[in-house]
């Protein structure tokens, strides 16, 4: 006859239940609620992340491959990272002996990066790197020193144009021929297509900035016009604060000035402007000449970097021709370089170098540097 072994598993389960009961008795109602919230967060994070991996696993099954442990580990690793970022930071904040936010955030980032394997795309790191450096440059001592020197606006814009010419040469040498920045700068396009594309971009950006001003800036329509400037009457545009201050020799001239003021106030108001005035004041019309200038410059860049002329021109000659084109289309140095496009091409260039030297530890170092830079 077989002798039954003592039920050790049953005793272990009962002992585990007793431990849980004692822990629950030690915790008050407030701590229980916090524990329930933490468990819900953990469940949500793992569940939401599981939805994205289920599609990958289904595709693998359709291809006739079996799901292995190596396929499940990325889901567990990434979910654990999200849980740490979601829970560990508020938990550390409650410890009285750790009152430094820098220590809290650095410890979380360090733990999270140790669990990762550098699977973050390089273009995301390039984006955060350029944005972090740009935000720090705004408050840097060198920037403050340049502002105190009171350089003229034309000098600063000319310096920007020189940097753009040098950056275009570097981008041509380093960018992938199939990438979007390369096609934007160097691909062949007719003049009209270039013009309407650039004008459309200017119009969209202008509408975007106007929408932001409408929702995030205070002010009434009585003291601001469409462009956000103070409404001034016709006399103020002519350099006189009030039309009553004009040296009027005839009383009829005063009535003329009053009439001109009325016409001017009606013209700047969109509600009373006719179709012709709205077209004249539209963003498309206002951006006509700036778009024309940038189109000429873009066509010049395409001409300089065409395959047939690549060997005939050196980089110095290309840079000189681009600077001369800037001087031709903008003799008064008023063509400002948009920070949006400057950052876009900077991110593209950084992404090229990240792809070239990309590996797990290098990505971790950059991520850790970005997190440190963001809280300094």
Swiss-Prot record:
Keyword Calcium set for record: no
Keywords, comma-separated and alphabetical: Membrane, Transmembrane, Transmembrane helix
Cellular location(s): Membrane
GO BP field: regulation of peroxisome organization
Cellular component GO terms held in the UniProt record: peroxisomal membrane; peroxisome
Membrane topology: Multi-pass membrane protein
Main localization (coarse): membrane
TM annotation in the entry: 153-173, 188-208
Name of this chain's protein: Uncharacterized protein YGR168C
High-level lineage: Eukaryota, Fungi, Dikarya, Ascomycota, Saccharomycotina
């Amino acid at each position: 006859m077989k002798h039954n072994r003592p039920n050790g598993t049953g005793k272990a389960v009962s002992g585990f239940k007793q431990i849980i009961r004692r822990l629950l008795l030690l915790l008050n109602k407030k701590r229980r609620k916090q524990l329930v919230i933490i468990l819900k967060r953990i469940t949500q994070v793992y569940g939401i992340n599981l939805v994205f991996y289920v599609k990958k696993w289904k595709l693998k099954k359709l291809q006739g491959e079996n799901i292995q442990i190596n396929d499940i580990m990325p889901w567990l690793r990434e979910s654990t990272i999200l849980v740490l970022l979601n829970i560990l930071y508020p938990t550390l904040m409650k410890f009285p002996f750790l009152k430094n936010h820098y220590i809290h955030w650095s410890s979380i980032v360090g733990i999270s990066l140790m669990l990762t394997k550098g699977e973050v795309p390089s273009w995301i790191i390039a984006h955060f790197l350029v944005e972090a450096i740009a935000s720090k440059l705004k408050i840097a001592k060198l920037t403050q020193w340049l502002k105190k020197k009171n350089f003229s606006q034309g000098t600063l814009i000319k310096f920007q144009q020189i940097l753009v010419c040098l950056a275009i040469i570097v981008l041509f040498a380093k960018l992938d021929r199939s990438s979007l920045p390369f096609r934007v700068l160097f691909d062949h396009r007719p003049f009209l297509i270039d013009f309407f594309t650039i004008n459309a971009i200017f119009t969209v950006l202008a509408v975007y900035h106007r929408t932001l001003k409408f929702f995030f800036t205070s002010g009434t329509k009585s003291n601001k016009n469409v462009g956000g400037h103070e409404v001034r009457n016709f006399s103020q545009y002519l350099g006189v604060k009030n039309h009553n201050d004009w040296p009027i020799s005839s009383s009829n001239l005063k009535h003329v000035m009053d009439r001109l003021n009325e016409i001017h106030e009606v013209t700047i108001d969109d509600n009373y402007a006719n179709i012709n005035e709205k077209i004249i004041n539209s963003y498309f019309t206002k951006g006509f000449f700036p778009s024309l200038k940038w189109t000429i410059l873009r066509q010049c860049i395409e001409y300089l970097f065409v395959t047939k002329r690549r060997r005939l021109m050196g980089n110095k000659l290309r840079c000189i021709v681009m600077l001369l084109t800037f001087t031709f289309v903008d003799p008064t140095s008023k063509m400002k370089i948009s920070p949006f496009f400057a950052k876009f091409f900077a991110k593209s260039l950084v992404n090229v170098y990240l792809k070239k030297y990309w590996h797990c530890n290098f990505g971790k170092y950059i991520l850790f540097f970005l997190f440190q830079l963001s809280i300094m």
